[in-house]
Structure formats: structure tokens, C-alpha cells
Amino acid sequence: MQKLVIHGGSKLHGEISISGAKNAALPVLCASLLTAEPFAIQNIPHLRDVTTMLALLEQIGVRILTNEPGTTELSAANITNPTASYDMVKTMRAAILVLGPLLARTGQAHISLPGGCAIGMRPVDQHIKGLQAMGAEINIEQGYILAQVGRLSGARIAMDVVTVTGTENLMMAATLASGTTILENAAREPEVIDLANCLIGMGAKIEGAGNDIIIIEGVDRLHGGSHVVMPDRIETGTFLTAVAACGGDVTLIGTRADTLDVVLGKLAEAGADIDIGGDWIRLCMQQRPQPVSLRTAPYPAFPTDMQAQFMALNSIAGGTSIMTETIFENRFMHVQELTRLNADIQVEGNTAIVHGIPQLDGASVMATDLRASACLIIAGLIAQGETIVDRIYHLDRGYEQIEQKLAQVGAHIKRIN
Ligand SMILES: CC(=O)N[C@H]1[C@@H](OP(=O)(O)OP(=O)(O)OC[C@H]2O[C@@H](n3ccc(=O)[nH]c3=O)[C@H](O)[C@@H]2O)O[C@H](CO)[C@@H](O)[C@@H]1O
Ligand SMILES: C=C(OP(=O)(O)O)C(=O)O
């Protein structure tokens, strides 16, 4: 099994290019199911989740016309098997995003329930309720969602909770429904806007993406075309947090500061100097970080996907911070690993109290999920001595060449077998 070996203590200097966003690329790949015409996607990151999604789409009947670095062209002219098996859904929760498009395009879908995962329960009741409101007949049998419909009908759907994949599934389904769908309490994440822009480029009629009410007027068919996936705001935030923790001066290229307002505000609160341009962000850190308290919540609030990385930063801050996780009930698994590096953290329910200490000490640690892996890399970069991060297969789901990108700005990090 592969591991990362990190020798901490180096400041980071230079430039890093940001990849396309995992959490935008995966729904956009699913959108290809909505048209019989070829559809090209650019700025796709090279990640394990993308490979898994392409394998799922192929099982469904999608042909991969081109798969070159950065560009993938797909044809869903013949959907032969509108199914996503448990094996697919359990390795990648975004597989649930084929449900809405398959039902809209073919009138049927046979999709495994995702079940829980390391970070918490991953219910899909809002997806199911929304599709039922649009006229789908849905039964759950042996852990599978069996859905069928003649044609989906537009409906007014008020979601009980803000759900990103739920909003994306229902928005995609509604593009081919008869009549108008109104999604209330919709997620406002930039990835929802990116998907809406992709669908609009295919001929969908969508208004309001980025607000909590999205209105979709169904059309008879969507056409092919192309879409450029937005830059990864979580990869961007991860590198910015690494520089804030290690000290140094790094510019991230090919990113979007407007998707990271709250994260940039928290990094400034930690003591970083930040400059932003059209497609770049420069962060310079010359002091020990100040503690930053935060509470995760749906966009535009602080993202749950950045909580773990900020905990590494707070672990060496000059004071105490309070970090509250409100999205997932089990997203503090990195705490136990950070304490192996001597971090001083107490967890009370969904709140972690982090007492910053001057120095972490290297140790062997185990990655438990995607963003916990990123947290442990940052912790290793600031710790004195050697840190070995095990189970990094989680990392490869969501970060493209992370160790190469960090090494390029001066980090001592390498992958070993
Ligand atoms: C709102 C939010 O921050 N969502 C995050 C969530 O998206 P993801 O789309 O995976 O999760 P959701 O946004 O759907 O879930 C948000 C919350 O709603 C609950 N829920 C969801 C669907 C449903 O049908 N019923 C239900 O109760 C979930 O248990 C969770 O507590 O994880 C992703 C990966 O870490 C992050 O990129 C997203 O930012
Ligand atoms: C946990 C994540 O992804 P997923 O929802 O695919 O598990 C993530 O992107 O941080």
C-alpha cells in the first residue's frame, strides 16, 4: 500500500496550478446522460473518482469518444443499462447523481442506496422525495432505488435540508420534465452554478442557480456541446492553508477567489497577507498563525470540506480555537491522528476545542477520508521530523498530483510503496 513520507519544517515558495474541481466534474459527467449528442468536457481533473465515474457511465452504455488529459468527450446515444450497482456507489457517493438524469432521459433507473460512509450518514431521502413529487414511482428493494416514470412533470419542491447532490440531481431531472420545476431551499454552492451553466449550454432553461430558489422550465431534449469545469476551490483552499501553516509565499494559478470568500477571510484572520487577481491568489505568511474559530455550514458559509485542513493550522496557532462541524456527524476522525503528532485537541459533540502548541512532532498516522488526508499532510509539513501518512488511497479520490504540487513549492514529501 502506498504511503507519503513528509519531512516537515520547510517554508513554501513558488507557484501551483489548480486543477478542475472534483465536485463539479462529477455532476457534469452525469449531465452527459441527458443528451443523445456528443458532449465534451474540459478541465477534468485526473482523479480516481473521475475514473470510477467514467467506468460507471460506460456500464450504463455511454461511449467514451475521447479521453485525453484535460478533455473527455462522451456519447450517451444508447443508454442500455440504467443501473448503478452498490460496488460503484459505495466507492464514490457521487454515483447517486446518475439517478435524476437516467430517470429523465429513459424513464427508469435502478440505483444502489449509498448508505453511510466514514464521515457520516449520507441519506438521499430528499432526492427521492423530489423525484416522487415530479411523478416518479419509486420503490426501495434490497438496498436499491427502483424508479420509473413515463415523463417527469415539473413540481414545486421544498427541500427540508440544504443538499448539494440533491439539488444537482433534481435540477438535472427537471431539465427534461414537462412544465416548470421550482426548487426551494436549494444549495447555493459554486458547483451547483457550474452544473447549471453546463446544462444551460446544452439548451436547458434554468434561472436562479446560486440562489436558494432555482426555476427550471423543462424542454423536450438537450443537445450536445462542451463545458469547461470550474477550478477546484477545495484544492485551492487546501494549498492556501498549507502555506498559512508552513509560512512562505505562494501564488495559486488558474483558480477563482470569488468562490472562497469565507475561507480567505479566515486565512487573513490567521495572519496571512492575501492578494487576488482575475485567476490567481497569492498568500504570504510571515508569522505564527493566530487561532481561527469557525462553524461549517452550507455555502456561502465555511465549507465542511475545509474543516480538517484548518484544524491542522489551528493546532500550531498562538491560542485556542473552537471548531464546529454541522454538516457531517463523524468528520473529526483526523483529531485522533493529529494527537499522535502531539496536537492538543478535545472533542465535545460536534465541536473541537483546539489549543495551539508551538510545534507538532512527526509520527506515523493513518488517513481516514479525503479531507482528513489533506489535514494530515499539512500537519506533516509543519511537524518537526518525519511523518508517514498511510492509507493515502483516499487522497487520490480528490487531489491531482498533490505531492508533486507541494514538492514544487519546496515541501519535502514523497510517495513510497
Ligand atoms: C451542504 C454541504 O455542505 N454539502 C456538502 C456535502 O455534499 P453532499 O451533496 O455529499 O451532501 P449533501 O449536501 O447532500 O448533505 C448535506 C446534509 O444534508 C443531509 N441530507 C442530504 C441529502 C438528503 O437527501 N437528506 C439529508 O438529510 C446530509 O446528511 C448532510 O447532513 O458533502 C460534500 C463532500 O464533503 C461537500 O462538498 C458539500 O459541501
Ligand atoms: C467527502 C467528499 O467527497 P464525497 O462526497 O464524494 O465523499 C469531499 O469532496 O470532501
From Swiss-Prot:
Annotated metabolic or biological route of this protein: Cell wall biogenesis; peptidoglycan biosynthesis
GO process annotations (BP): cell division; cell wall organization; peptidoglycan biosynthetic process; regulation of cell shape; UDP-N-acetylgalactosamine biosynthetic process
Localization per record: Cytoplasm
Cited InterPro entries: Enolpyruvate_Tfrase_dom, Enolpyruvate_Tfrase_sf, MurA_subfamily, RNA3'P_cycl/enolpyr_Trfase_a/b, UDP_GlcNAc_COvinyl_MurA
Cellular component terms per the entry's GO annotation: cytoplasm
Superkingdom, taxonomy of origin: Bacteria
UniProt keyword Transmembrane, yes or no: no
Reactions it catalyzes: phosphoenolpyruvate + UDP-N-acetyl-alpha-D-glucosamine = UDP-N-acetyl-3-O-(1-carboxyvinyl)-alpha-D-glucosamine + phosphate
Enzyme Commission number(s): 2.5.1.7
A GO term for molecular function: UDP-N-acetylglucosamine 1-carboxyvinyltransferase activity
Amino acids binding UDP-N-acetyl-alpha-D-glucosamine: 93, 122-126, 305, 327
Residue positions binding phosphoenolpyruvate: 22-23
In-chain residues carrying the UniProt-annotated modification 2-(S-cysteinyl)pyruvic acid O-phosphothioketal: 117
Alphabetical keyword list: Cell cycle, Cell division, Cell shape, Cell wall biogenesis/degradation, Cytoplasm, Peptidoglycan synthesis, Pyruvate, Transferase
Record-annotated active site: 117 (proton donor)
Job description of the protein: Cell wall formation. Adds enolpyruvyl to UDP-N-acetylglucosamine.
Database matches in NCBIfam families: murA, PRK09369.1
Family (UniProt): Belongs to the EPSP synthase family. MurA subfamily.
Protein name in UniProt: UDP-N-acetylglucosamine 1-carboxyvinyltransferase
Protein encoded by which gene: murA
